[in-house]
C-alpha cells in the first residue's frame, strides 16, 4: 500500500515534467472521476505517446494475488527495469486469491486506488471497462507495441473488450491491457506409477487413475481444484465441459440456460462428480492450487491438474518427498498437455496488466513506459528465464522459455487449444454461482443434475437482469 509522504519543494525540471505529464493525462483522469455529465462510464483514453517521465523517486505499485509469480515479477522488475529507470521501485502488493477481485474493485468503486497497475483476469476486463476503472490503451498500443509478435487470441484475451469468439481478435476493437503472464492447466503424472506415456484421452486418464489408486494404497488417483472460492471449482467443471463437447453459453444471444446444461454439459457433470471425484482424497472437497501441489509433492496423487505458473515448486527438493534433487523428482514426475476427448480444449489462464484510471499522472506515465519495456522481445525472454510465462510468440518459442521448466513446452503446445469463460461485466456473479453449485455437487450437498440446472437458471437470471451486451468466449 502506498502511503502519503511529505513532499518538499520540487526542482524546476521536476515541476516541468509533472506539469507536462498532468496535461497529457488530465482528460483521462477527469473521465475516470465521473466527469461525464452523468452518462454511463467508459474507459478513459491513454495518450499514444508516453508523457515525459519524472526524475524524482517513484514507486510503481501492482496488485495481484499471493502466489509465486507475484514474487518473481517483483524481483525481476526491480532487477531489470531499474537498469532503465533507476529512480523507480516496483512493488507487487498481494492479497489472498479469494479476495483478489474484491480487493481491486472495492478501490475502483471508491475511485481511488493504492495501486497503479492492476493485474486482471481476462474476465475482469469487462467490469473494469464499463465502470471506467482502467485506461483505454488502444492508441498507445498502436504506437508502441508490435502486435504482430503475438498470437492474436492471447492479445485479445488479456486486453480486448468486447471479447471476440475464441481464437479471433477484432482488429477494430479497443485494447485495455497487455499480456503479463500466460497460463493453462498441465496434467502432472507419476511416471514411476503409471509409466512414461501420459493418458491421451479423458476416459483413459480416469481409467489409469483408478488402476493406479487400486495398485497403490494411500495414493489417490486424482487431485484437482474443488474449492468454492476464486474460480476453482468452476474452472474444473468448465474444463471437463469443454473436452466432452459442451459450451458455457451462446455469447451472441447471451443464452446460458439450455446451453451449459444440455446433454454434453450433463455428461461432463456426471463424469466430474461420479467418475473423477471418487478418485480424490478424503477431505479434498475444498482443495485449490496449494493443496493440489502439496498432494503431488508428498507423493499422494497419481495424476493431478494445476496451473503451469504455480507448478515450479514441485521441483524443489525442499518441498518434495519424491527426490533429494530436481533430477530425482523429474524421474518420477511428468508434465503433459491435457487429454482430449470429444474436443481438445484447455482452459485459458494467465492475466494481463492494465493502468488504473485513478493513479496520479506520473504513475500512469510510468505504467505505460513499463508496459512498453516489458513487452520487448529481449525482456520477454528474460522474463521467461526468470520463471514467467510470456505471450510473445518469439519468446514462447525461445530456448530461454522452453528449457527453463519441463512444463513450459506444455504451455507452448496448449495455446492453440485454449478457451476462456464469459468476458462480461457480470463475470463475478456468474463465477460465484458456478463455484457454489459445482462445489456442492462435488461434496454431495446437491444432486449433480440439479446443480447444473441451477447454475443455468441462476446465471441466465443474472444476464437477463443486466440486459447488457458484449463479451465473448465459449
Predicted regions and their residues:
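Conserved N-terminal structural module of periplasmic/extracytoplasmic solute-binding proteins
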Residues: 2-14, 18-25, 33-133, 147-149, ...
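Short, solvent-exposed loop/beta-turn-alpha elements that line the ligand-binding surface or hinge
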Residues: 52-53, 138-153, 198, 226-228, ...
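Extracytoplasmic/periplasmic substrate-recognition and gating elements
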Residues: 173-174, 193, 270, 274-280, ...
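Extracytoplasmic/periplasmic solute-binding protein
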Residues: 165-181, 185, 204-257, 292-294, ...
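Glycine-centered hinge/linker elements that transmit conformational signals in sensory
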Residues: 208-209, 253-286
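Hinge/lid segment of periplasmic solute-binding proteins
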Residues: 49-52, 123-184, 233, 330-336
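Short helix-initiation/N-cap motifs at beta->coil->alpha
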Residues: 94-103, 203-204, 283-297
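Long, aromatic- and glycine/proline-rich binding clefts that accommodate carbohydrate-like moieties
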Residues: 155, 330-337, 384-436, 440, ...
